[in-house]
Amino acid sequence: MESALTARDRVGVQDFVLLENYTSEAAFIENLRKRFKENLIYTYIGSVLVSVNPYKELEIYSKQHMERYRGVSFYEVSPHIYAIADNSYRSLRTERKDQCILISGESGAGKTEASKKILQYYAVTCPVSDQVETVKDRLLQSNPVLEAFGNAKTLRNDNSSRFGKYMDVQFDYKGAPVGGHILNYLLEKSRVVHQNHGERNFHIFYQLLEGGEEDLLRRLGLDKNAQNYQYLIKGQCARVSSINDKNDWKVVRRALSIINFNDDDIEELLSIVASVLHLGNVQFATDEHGHAQVTTENQIKYLARLLSVDSTVLRESLIHKKIIAKGEELNSPLNLEQAAYARDALAKAIYGRTFSWLVSKINKSLAYKGTDMHKLGSASVIGLLDIYGFEVFQHNSFEQFCINFCNEKLQQLFIELTLKSEQDEYESEGIAWEPVQYFNNKIICDLVEEKFKGIISILDEECLRPGEATDMTFLEKLEDTVKNHPHFVTHKLGDQKTRKVLGRDEFRLLHYAGEVNYSVAGFLDKNNDLLFRNLKEVMCDSGNPIAHQCFNRSELTDKKRPETAATQFKNSLSKLMEILMSKQPSYVRCIKPNDAKQPARFDEVLIRHQVKYLGLIENVRVRRAGFAYRRKYEIFLQRYKSLCPDTWPNWDGRAMDGVAVLVKSLGYKPEEYKMGRTKIFIRFPKTLFATEDALEVRKHSIATFLQARWRGYHQRQKFLHMKHSAVEIQSWWRGTIGRRKAAKRKWAVDVVRRFIKGFIYRNQPRCTENEYFLDYIRYSFLMTLYRNQPKSVLDKSWPVPPPSLREASELLREMCMNNMVWKYCRRINPEWKQQLEQKVVASEIFKDKKDNYPQSVPRLFINTRLGNDEINTKILQQLESQTLTYAVPVVKYDRKGYKPRRRQLLLTQNAAYLVEEAKMKQRIDYANLTGISVSSLSDNLFVLHVKCEDNKQKGDAILQSDHVIETLTKVAITAEKINNININQGSIKFTVGPGKEGIIDFTAGSELLIAKAKNGHLSVVAPRLNSR
């Protein structure tokens, strides 16, 4: 830990005890802020761990981190929850004394996560066997089950524990976890029937609806919509973006299986959960006598089936109250309000008792199953207390009263045990104990729990007394009994300023953590936790095994009045205190950095409030009352011995004597330190800081000295090693080179001899003398052929073969060509085949004849240039009996004036059509198509020559197409006029009408120009693209 002091200005100190101004709340919070900013969420107060919830995942919980803290002294590594867990475990193993880890803090501070991390640490680092592995799994998997049934979303926390939990983890003599046991405290049953705005009911309800299989929900009579259930819509917050109920359901189902729930147990448990939802949907109406009547029979049927009770008896029990007077049983009808109260009371009782049964069932699964129980010994337990923190809301009720009383008791225990551990350490080290002044909250605990005069006793008395007892009569009795107590105030007892903020139905307690106003509304009902007798009778007769176990028939015959909720809680709290007092405690204080649950946000006001009510400044004061720093002599000497010439580099005597020499050399004043039996105690942090800063300076000079010596030694060793290696390598390499040369020379002579002989006999039949040469020639030719074989059908190259392989070469050449042709043909599909056929036709007609033909070669011919949506529907109707094979937009020039007009050229099986929008302008039967003329230049003009035997027949068609090569190829193929396409140079004659002709003149120019010439001809100027 001391090594981190050099960065204390940036990241703060790792132990609040080392703060110079340790009584300053501002200095405390500033140190928290520095560390939180650097994602250092853990800080010590002596042996107490302060944890700030980061609201994000940090990379500090891996197996590597666990190993780093495993078996390491508490102060040798940075603060961490694993350090607390490991310290407790090592104390358990070495001192054989039971341990407990007390985790406290307000809702959302990270208590549940802290307890999970501790369990995960033990699961990974403790010894393993098959049985131990099963126990580890069950310990870990008990968490999601308890969270599902006992946690809920509140305004401050999406996974708030609504019950207190104390878990004992049992270890055997080898240090392996072999069992566990859970105690639960004060489940918030009122949440089952009511939630504040923005809050939810317990997670299990939403998980069941969201993740339950269709078949399961059908058996339970449920549907997936949470809005259909009265107990789930009070908070208007059924869905939460940060909670995935469907995935959580899968985790819970798997966890139930691991902790030994069979399918029947799960089905019975979920039947009870479903019954609570159905119970919330039971509605009442008043009859003419003002008595309540059930109006939702379907819900009663579902309830009766799920709980295996008689539906008639259940219905009557919800609207009647059984009264036993003078040995006679009377059924008194309930009004609307009383029936609703009875329904909600039953729902709370069912859920609360089921939760207790669930904890009991988990305990059976966690119980140690071994036969060698005696081997566990007395020091075999580590307890984890994860309990609600101090709560202060705008509206505080009975639950907050109990929770805050619990925190008062824990604070009292915390101060007592902390002071005791400090005093014990001082006494064991032979240092005088200096009394510490601190606030003793015993006065507040007595105010709540004192017999006859305490608030709980008064509350019980008011619940039990005959007559009309109300919440206000309870408050009046409080005012009469404890009116003079300095930590108790009501509206009636307060001054004028207090009356402005304190309601008439409220009382205020001045807790150690601050003032809290409690509303007495509901105190008597919640304390009585009353369930009508006839409803108990119904549940005792339930055929559901879990419900039957939860409602024992002995309750009906027991004349003794059951303990009230507050008394039960007080008694269970007293037992918890006894458990904790019997163990060696460790503490984790959890702090919530902001209410918005956002990472990297530090709300100073909220944190100051938590620092105050957790008593952290008080804790620092107690720890600093004597000495801020203490370490064993061996550790202190080992760290700082370099600061004194007499102790550096080694001290041969006792560590205590070495430390005495060291502190004298450092100039410590007598009032700054004390020497104990095994430890040195330093009173002021500044003394330790000065020592640490001196060590940091000394490290540089030591490092320089060591570097110089090490570099010299290292380089010398390196040189000697290299020299030796060089000699060895040279010797070995020279021998190797010599042997290789001799072998290579021998091989070369043999090769040359065989090659010469082969060359001499090369033209003779194969024999011993020429076989090597012929094999080489054959191999050489084949390898040359392999590297230079043709890549395509068009490649006619072929290596020249030697005389002996000419025949084989020709055979190979023919096989290679056939193979390439076969491969090429195999890859051609029908569409590509058609494309090639059209390209072949185009080549036959235009290659080396028309200038713009080369530009068309790499472009694929399109099936049609016009879609059906671009051709007028009337035209398509006229062509209905004919198949349209090709369509292209063209420009048609008049035969007389040469005026250009936009047309569509449509080709069918029998004729070509010139179309203007919806009008058919000219039909040219292929039988009347005598020829097609086109120039040799790069223009796109062509003429379709048509027979013209009378005046009714139109003459030739002069057309222009942007895709002239494609268009003419399509026309030639469709009309079967491949040999009738004339490519002209200079001019083209065309027929205007019977006996009349026109001329189109073509000349080469720089750019395309089509216009009527002065001589009446159509003049076309087109650039030349190649010389052909």
From Swiss-Prot:
Biological role stated in the UniProt entry: Myosins are actin-based motor molecules with ATPase activity. Unconventional myosins serve in intracellular movements. Their highly divergent tails are presumed to bind to membranous compartments, which would be moved relative to actin filaments.
Quaternary structure note: Interacts (via its IQ motifs) with calmodulin.
InterPro entries: IQ_motif_EF-hand-BS (IPR000048), Kinesin_motor_dom_sf (IPR036961), Myosin_head_motor_dom-like (IPR001609), Myosin_TH1 (IPR010926), MYSc_Myo1 (IPR036072), P-loop_NTPase (IPR027417)
Modified residue annotations for N6-methyllysine: 348
Major subcellular location class: cytoplasm
The organism of origin for this protein: Aquarana catesbeiana
Gene3D superfamilies linked: 1.10.10.820, 1.20.5.190, 1.20.58.530, 6.20.240.20, Kinesin motor domain, Myosin VI head, motor domain, U50 subdomain
Cited Pfam families: IQ, Myosin_head, Myosin_TH1
IQ domain mapped to chain residues: 699-728, 722-751
Protein name: Unconventional myosin-Ic
Assigned keywords, A-Z: Acetylation, Actin-binding, ATP-binding, Cell membrane, Cell projection, Cytoplasm, Cytoplasmic vesicle, Membrane, Methylation, Motor protein, Myosin, Nucleotide-binding, Repeat
Gene that this polypeptide is encoded by: Myo1c
Domain TH1 residues, every copy: 850-1024
